Design a protein with these regions (language model features):
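Extracellular loop and loop/strand-boundary signature of outer-membrane beta-barrel proteins
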Residues: 39-43, 77-84, 127-134, 168-172
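Short N-terminal segments immediately surrounding and downstream of signal-peptide cleavage
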Residues: 22-39
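Subset of outer-membrane beta-barrel
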Residues: 46, 151, 163, 168-172
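Generic short beta-strand segments
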Residues: 32-36, 73, 163-166
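Surface-exposed strand-loop-strand hairpins of Gram-negative outer-membrane beta-barrel proteins
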Residues: 35-54, 137-138
Length: 189
């Protein structure tokens, strides 16, 4: 299977015209991210978190590239005299299709596959010693979505919005009703 995928990627890269490219070879994005994680605890509860999103996209053809995407989201939940630090990290890779909507705007769509990691948080109970869980949980992550970049200068774009539907599967169960929204700066090389 790995041989087949390698052959497929190499064939596509060789077959596509690389010369008449009006998109940059490399784009690096960094910015703010909001994540709504549904069924976060396996009991149907959701959590709204804030954090960061970073990605790098290598464009090997005019409208086709491959991306590496990383993010971290955080929130302190308080309930019935206790607090819990929620941390959600994702790492994903996959194809990106992009097109110039005009001279000033570029649209893109991607399908990213990778993992999610939720480190153990400490639960602080009023009037009792701190209790920390013994293990973390990790699982499969899939993000499908896209966005719009606005040209600022030759080498800088503003990511107006990136919206993704995210499936995050961990020990807590599959979380299918997740939405992440990002905005920030894109550096083009």
């Amino acid at each position: 299977m790995a041989r087949f995928l390698t052959l497929l990627v190499v064939s596509i890269a060789v077959a596509l015209p690389l010369s008449a490219q009006d998109s940059p070879k490399l784009e690096v994005f960094g910015g703010y991210q909001y994540l709504h994680a549904g069924n976060f605890d396996g009991a149907g509860d959701s959590v709204n978190t804030n954090g960061w999103n970073a990605s790098a996209t290598f464009n090997f053809a005019k409208h086709l590239g491959i991306a590496a995407d990383f993010s971290g989201n955080y929130k302190t939940e308080q309930s019935e005299g206790s607090t819990a630090d929620v941390r959600i990290y994702t790492y994903a890779f996959g194809p990106v299709v992009s097109a110039n909507a005009s001279e000033k705007f570029r649209i893109f769509a991607h399908a990213l596959f990778g993992g999610v990691h939720v480190p153990t948080g400490c639960f602080l109970f009023s009037g009792s010693p701190n209790e920390c869980g013994a293990s973390s949980t990790s699982g499969f992550a899939m993000m499908i979505g896209g966005g719009v970049d606005a040209r600022m200068t030759k080498h800088f774009d503003f990511r107006v919005v990136q919206i993704d539907w995210a499936r995050l599967a961990s020990e807590f169960g599959a979380q299918n009703s997740n939405v992440r929204v990002s905005t920030g700066i894109v550096v083009r090389f």
